[in-house]
């Protein structure tokens, strides 16, 4: 016989535990703790992979899709940008381009492809900046991870995105943060990012190569 609301049909659920706000909060905190541990583990594995010159597919697995697309775009810019276009670049972009052209001109490549990837991770010195400082604790907020300096942990210098099941480095957003202090030099001297890029290039390579000058602002016949 059919009953009213709350009849025997529904009574089976009456004794089932209801997930309280406290339980949901505890579950959320546990998930966040797991994600934080995964972020810390991912970063250590990334550093180890870079140190050991892992294959390109391994390295790209640590980067966001937007970072991979940006690397392809930047490599194309290294092949076609002239001096006028170079003046539109941020320092880290301009430095990657002139360094890429130096490697091309002096036949320094030891990889057949994904050259901009290897250039930025191994030869640019950008990640060395991070290795030389004391890092603060990693932090996460929903699907965004970050880490700052120990002296100012709330100011990030590296950013990460949660990609369904794992963390990935957002290289596009990280490089401007890493090089922010260097870019301050350009502002003080009223230099463009491209001019500062040449200054940095000369500091690193002036004892090894000649013509570290504006000739690198032009395509060199790729």
What are these regions (language model features)?
Residues 130-164, 168-222:
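Low-complexity, intrinsically disordered terminal/linker segments enriched in charged
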Residues 34-35, 73-88, 178-198:
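Charged, low-complexity, helix-prone segments enriched in Lys/Glu/Asp/Gln
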Residues 2-3:
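C-terminal motif of bacterial Sec signal peptides marking the signal peptidase cleavage site
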Residues 46, 50-53, 66, 81, ...:
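Short, flexible helical or helix-coil boundary motifs
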Residues 53-99:
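Short, well-ordered alpha-helical segments enriched in acidic and aromatic residues
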Residues 64, 90-93, 111-113, 170, ...:
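Helix N-terminus capping/helix-initiation residues
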Residues 91-131:
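Acidic, glycine-rich loop-and-strand cores that form catalytic or ligand-binding grooves
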Residues 6-55, 61, 65-72, 211-220:
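Short, low-complexity N-terminal intrinsically disordered segments enriched in polar/charged residues
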């Amino acid at each position: 016989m059919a009953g009213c609301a709350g009849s025997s049909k529904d009574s089976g659920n009456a004794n089932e535990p209801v997930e309280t706000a406290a339980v949901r909060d505890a579950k959320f905190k546990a998930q966040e703790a797991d994600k934080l541990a995964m972020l810390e583990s991912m970063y250590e594995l990334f550093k180890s992979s870079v140190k050991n010159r892992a294959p390109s597919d391994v390295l790209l697995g640590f980067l966001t899709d937007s970072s991979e697309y940006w690397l392809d775009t930047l490599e194309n810019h290294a092949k076609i940008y002239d001096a006028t276009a170079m003046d539109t670049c941020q320092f880290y972009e301009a430095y990657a381009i002139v360094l890429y052209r130096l490697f091309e001109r002096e036949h320094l490549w030891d990889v057949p492809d994904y050259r901009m990837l290897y250039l930025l991770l191994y030869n640019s010195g950008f990640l060395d900046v991070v290795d030389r400082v004391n890092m603060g604790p990693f932090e996460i907020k929903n699907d965004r991870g970050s880490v700052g300096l120990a002296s100012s942990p709330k100011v990030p210098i590296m950013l990460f995105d949660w990609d369904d099941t794992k963390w990935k480095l957002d290289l596009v957003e990280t490089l401007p943060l890493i090089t922010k202090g260097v870019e301050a030099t350009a502002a003080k001297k009223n230099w463009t990012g491209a001019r500062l890029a040449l200054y940095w290039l000369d500091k690193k390579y002036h004892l090894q190569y000649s013509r570290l000058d504006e000739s690198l602002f032009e395509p060199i016949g790729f």
